[in-house]
Amino acid sequence: DTIQGDIEENHGSDDTEGSSDSAENASENQSGDLTFADLAKYSFEFCSGAGGWSTDFEIEKDGSFKGSYHDSDMGDTGDDYENGTMYLCGFSGKFTDLTKINDYTYQMKMENLTYDETPGKEEIADGVKYIYTDVYGLEGTDTFKVYLPGAPVRDLSEDVYFWVRWANDDSEEGTQDTLTIPIIVNEEMGYGIYSYERQTPYEEAQST
């Protein structure tokens, strides 16, 4: 039940094992095009792969999304915050107008981006200085592209692929020439946001 599998079924794959799945998909989406319900199967993350900071969010079936951003600078201390400084935000909004560009590429709009705390607000608790910020990764534009598994890597700018290469290609040579995961692209800022399969509440409970 992957987006890649849906693509293969929609484009006449010879694999007949997914016939029941394709019937189920057809009942949900007559056109066979990508829906927000497809994207709701994934969690999305924007980070460098080196740890320290990340932006994480999930999209629901209606296009709404919710997530958080965090970064830390434990060396940035003061009299009241000897344990360092944290940058963070909680955010929510909605993606709309999911439009097909080609077999592997869609475009969508972002609306109503709101924050749990006002960006710029600061507070100190438990020896840590908390600074609330804008969300890193979704700024600078209200238009985003979605690239699906199978999309040629050459369709992405070097700046964008830099952010997702480590999640997309586990070969030492870096020879993967197509996407293996869905990604969201902020072209205005040159950001690529990778994805992984979303856990169910039961799976999340088991992993904690």
Describe the residue ranges of each PLM region.
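Generic hydrophobic, helix-prone segments enriched in Leu/Val/Ile
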Residues: 1, 95, 144-148
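N-terminal, intrinsically disordered, polar/charged segments of Gram-positive cell-envelope systems
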Residues: 1-46
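Tryptophan-anchored aromatic micro-motifs
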Residues: 28-56, 66, 187-207
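Surface-exposed coil/turn segments at beta-strand junctions on protein surfaces, enriched
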Residues: 37-39, 60, 139
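N-terminal glycine/threonine-rich, aromatic-flanked beta-hairpin/loop signature
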Residues: 50-120
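Beta-strand-rich cores of mature extracytoplasmic or soluble domains
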Residues: 117-207
